């Protein structure tokens, strides 16, 4: 017999809910969508253009989409330097953002002219990758070298093109700091990973105190 699940309160009264249709505005000081769909992993992406120009930028909409082969993706509103570079070269590197790298990551999202090196701007060290011609962030404990699988211009439900582009890339090489491998398992809660939590400035950090375990029912 399945175990009894805890009671949860019902909220079926419309008076208890804020309702809005995104196309008509949300009526709040800040769009709640980003805060609700979160916290989200940060897509700290390094790229290189066909002319050799290097770019490093964080993306709020980023995640993994497949296990085998491993595929990750980030969404960019055009015309961003990262999008231009991946369209030209078909390669990028994702760099894990940790609490100690938060300020440097934030610095790399400054609006600067194309060609300005965000590695230098944020005081970070670029190191060569093995399978792609894009530098990694040496200070980041995890790097994914990626080759572009597909770049999609997103559409709304009417089939109209938006100004957002989703770049999907296959992870072809992985670099992990060995101290974060505990008995062969990546120490997610010990890495100090930070997430985008929505709002104009909110972030969250993953730590051991927030962990709980739950196994799939049999």
Where are these regions (language model features)?
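Basic, polyanion-binding surface patches
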Residues: 1-218
């Amino acid at each position: 017999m399945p175990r009894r699940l805890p009671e949860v309160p019902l909220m079926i009264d419309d008076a208890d809910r804020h309702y809005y249709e995104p196309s008509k505005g949300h009526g709040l000081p800040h769009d709640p969508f980003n805060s609700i769909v979160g916290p989200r992993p940060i897509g700290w992406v390094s790229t290189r253009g066909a002319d050799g120009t290097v770019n490093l930028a964080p993306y709020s909409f980023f995640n993994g989409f497949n296990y085998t082969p491993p595929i990750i993706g980030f969404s960019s509103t055009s015309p961003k330097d990262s999008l231009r570079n991946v369209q030209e070269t078909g390669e990028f590197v994702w760099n894990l953002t940790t609490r100690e790298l938060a300020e440097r990551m934030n610095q790399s999202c400054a609006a600067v002219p194309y060609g300005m090196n965000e590695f230098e701007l944020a005081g970070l060290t670029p190191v060569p990758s093995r399978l792609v011609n894009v530098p990694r962030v040496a200070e980041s404990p995890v790097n994914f070298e990626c080759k572009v699988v597909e770049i999609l211009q997103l559409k709304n439900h009417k089939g109209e093109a938006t100004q957002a582009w989703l770049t999907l890339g296959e992870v072809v090489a992985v670099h992990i700091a060995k101290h974060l491998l505990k008995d062969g398992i990546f120490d997610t809660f010990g890495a100090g990973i930070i997430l985008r939590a929505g709002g104009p400035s909110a972030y969250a950090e993953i730590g051991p105190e927030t962990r709980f375990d739950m196994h799939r029912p049999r």
